[in-house]
Amino acid sequence: MCGRYTLFTSADELASRFGTEPPETEPRYNCAPGQELPVVSGGEITHQRWGLVPEWADDDTNPPINARAETITEKPTFAEAVEHRRCLVPADGFYEWDDGTPYRIAFDDDRPFAMAGIWSRWEPPTRQSGLGEFGNGGVSDNPEPIYSFAVVTTDPNGLVGNLHHRMAVILDPSEESTWLHGPVEDALDCCGPYPDDDMIAHPVSTRVNDPRNDDPSLIERTGAA
């Protein structure tokens, strides 16, 4: 799975890499589910909540953060999104755990990359006039729509496979347009494990376990392995 990642690439570099205007973003060393994070869709970088809430959901509790590429078209939660609402999730590294030890996996030059994502727009139910309690999800009288996303996963490459049985779909730059705009069959053909030729992994501090920690020390190598 993909449950934590980093994105400390500058706004200008992200804009250059993805062909957008510079986003309003700050360096992130511990991106976690439930947070508002950058995604690329419609030619711009916006922020969406990590954890996909489908349009038909009654509430926004326990949203899935990952979607398996192999079954994504079969699951009601993901089927419409993968057909019509694909996105790129910028990152420059991600974390996986092995026997309690967290590792950061990245390219050896820390270059940014795109993980395959899907997104949704959910309208929270409104509270009916005159009722004293909120509707599902604890929403207010005039709730704002929630934009949310999930990261697509696939089998791991050799490097990640030493740590976990799944990994995020990392798209080659040549595949990004197909993922965003191509027929779903062609898009899913892009969802194999990314080669590990120039990827590296090193152990990091268990401070990354707590999503409240978010500073550069989290990506530093430790002596755990």
Question: Model segments located where?
Answer:
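Short linear sequence motif anchored by a di-proline
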Residues: 1-225
